A protein has these predicted regions:
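Conserved class I S-adenosyl-L-methionine
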Residues: 1-32, 45-49, 68, 126-151
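Short conserved AdoMet
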Residues: 29, 55, 73, 106, ...
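Class I SAM-dependent methyltransferase SAM/SAH-binding core
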Residues: 35-87
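Conserved Class I S-adenosyl-L-methionine
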Residues: 43-45, 161-259
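A short acidic, Gly/Pro-enriched loop at the edge of an enzyme's catalytic core
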Residues: 85-96
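A short SAM/SAH-binding and catalytic strip from SAM-dependent methyltransferases
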Residues: 95-108, 131
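A short glycine-rich, Lys/Arg-flanked "PGG" loop and its adjoining helix->strand segment in the class I
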Residues: 109-124
Length: 259
């Protein structure tokens, strides 16, 4: 899977995208972790929250995208380029945070089980994954990409890696780390957006990144133009010009048993 990330486009909805991260981290009860790892740090603007929360911890950050790593470094984060599939918690990795990353990884359930099992005693694993695959924003894009007009240019279409339910992740994590405290839930955030194509702008910065990598600039602009009226019909603005965009997210926090 190729992802062509645009940090500036991704950050266009900073306030909205930050809230799930903050909600996730607020449920992590670690007091004095030795090492905190941010897997999929993106442009690094939220990694600083971890450093502020745990100022005495070593904070490590990584992302698979070289553009995101460069943006994170510009934000003062000592990020490295790495694939989350290669990560294993070390003996002092007391907190692992993965926010809006694992839905890109087909085998993410295996990763969660491995990370949970490898955490040191008392360690915490905190994960958030977008679960909006069945929403109109995604189904409209998926159907359009499967049409005769677009299937030849994007034969892989819009990938869907099957984000699970909170119960599924709770059972998986509890089995992977017997005796752990597991807290899983889901939240649908309702984002007030403005602009001519607000939902299109949102998914252009995230969901459609693999598609963007497969298209020329001209094809990408044509796809955006094809999508825009369909998305506006599904998400019409109210009388004040606000488009209300619902976005489901699934959370899981595990606290490994202590010594």
């Amino acid at each position: 899977m190729t992802l062509l990330w645009d940090p500036a486009l991704y950050r266009r909805h900073d306030d909205h995208r930050a809230r799930p991260f903050l909600d996730l981290v607020s449920r992590v009860g670690a007091i004095a972790p030795r090492e905190v790892v941010d897997l999929g740090c993106g442009p690094g603007h939220l990694t600083g929250v971890l450093a502020q929360r745990w100022p005495d911890a070593r904070v490590r950050a990584s992302d698979a995208s070289p553009d995101m790593v460069a943006a994170a470094r510009d934000n003062g984060v000592d990020a490295v380029q790495a694939d989350v599939r290669d990560f294993t918690p070390g003996p002092e990795t007391d907190v692992v945070v993965s926010n809006a990353v694992l839905h890109w990884v087909p085998e993410h359930r295996d990763l969660l089980a491995r990370w949970a099992a490898a955490l040191p005693a008392g360690g915490r694993l905190a994960v958030q994954v977008p679960g909006n695959e069945s929403s109109p924003s995604h189904t409209i894009a998926r159907d359009l990409l499967a049409s005769e007009a677009w299937a030849p240019q994007v034969p892989d279409g819009l990938a869907a890696y099957g984000v699970g339910t909170p119960e599924e992740y709770a059972r998986l994590l509890a089995a992977a780390r017997p005796g752990a405290h597991v807290d899983c839930w889901e939240t649908t955030y309702l984002h007030p957006l403005t602009g001519d194509d607000p939902v299109g702008d949102w998914i252009a910065g995230t969901t459609l990144r693999p598609v963007r990598a497969a298209l020329t600039d001209a094809e990408w602009e044509r796809l955006r133009a094809d999508l825009a009226p369909r998305l506006r019909a599904a998400y019409p603005p109210d009388d004040a010009g606000t488009t209300w965009f619902g976005f489901r997210r699934v959370f899981a926090v595990l606290a490994a048993p202590g010594d």
